[in-house]
Amino acid sequence: MTKLHLTYYTSYYANYKNIPKDFLCVGISRFIPETFKYSNYNNFIWNKDNFLAPSIQLLSDIKNNKIDEDEYSKRYITEVLSRVQSYTGFETLAEWLVSFDNELAQQQTEWKAVVFMCYEVPSDFCHRHLLKKLFNNYYKIPIEELVLNKVNAKTT
């Protein structure tokens, strides 16, 4: 199993204000909520070219019922894996995550965890759940959905 400095979670934008301020929130959606564009959230980062986000075409196909969740899942994984090297220079998602984690550790920030965020609530089908499964099952890197009562119990 890959050893990381920080703990990694997934969550959704509507949950942002409940997330501890010492958790770095990383937007992994194709677009971000308007409130995030004009606010000074010190613990939120987002890149409009985010290689972890589904393509506009993939989003359109699922929203217009041209594909089902199984097809979306296959295409999303294929998209992300094909973009890793061109967007990051790394061969695998695991290598990218280790580098990202090391970079945060070298910055000597007070971050206790990283939260990958998008729009959908935990019960909805979403690419962040696919990303979490990919890290957990394929790379053996533990990432789980953020459950705040568990987190608050650990930090108090």
Question: Could you describe each region identified by the protein language model?
Answer:
Residues M1-T156:
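Residues lining hydrophobic/aromatic ligand-binding pockets adjacent to catalytic sites
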